[in-house]
């Protein structure tokens, strides 16, 4: 996970999770991470590692490129 702030990717993840009707806990369970990790992503404190990135995008029906280019 990167430690650089990622406000735009945080917004994309949060809005996609809400649009999917998932709570942070439900998303964490589907992704196999803690709820704290989801909060970390949604606060923009960091981004998922590559393996979690693709799984997260699959669950939320978003493109990895949207997250990777959001804060550049």
Regions flagged by a language model, labelled:
Residues 1-19:
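A short, Lys/Arg-rich alpha-helix, primarily the initiator
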Residues 1-4, 40, 58, 68-72:
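Short, charged recognition helix plus adjacent turn
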Residues 12, 23, 49-52, 63:
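Residues that mark the N-terminal boundary/hinge immediately upstream of a DNA-recognition element
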Residues 18, 29, 58:
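Alpha-helical residues within the helix-turn-helix
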Residues 21-40:
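Short alpha-helical DNA-recognition segment
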Residues 32, 51-66:
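DNA major-groove recognition helix of helix-turn-helix/homeodomain DNA-binding modules
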């Amino acid at each position: 996970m990167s430690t650089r702030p990622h406000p735009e990717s945080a917004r994309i993840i949060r809005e996609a999770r809400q649009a999917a009707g998932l709570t942070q806990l439900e998303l964490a369970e589907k992704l196999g991470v803690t709820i704290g990790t989801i909060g970390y992503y949604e606060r923009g404190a960091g981004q998922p590692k590559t393996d979690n990135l693709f799984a997260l995008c699959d669950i939320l029906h978003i493109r990895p490129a949207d997250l990777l280019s959001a804060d550049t």
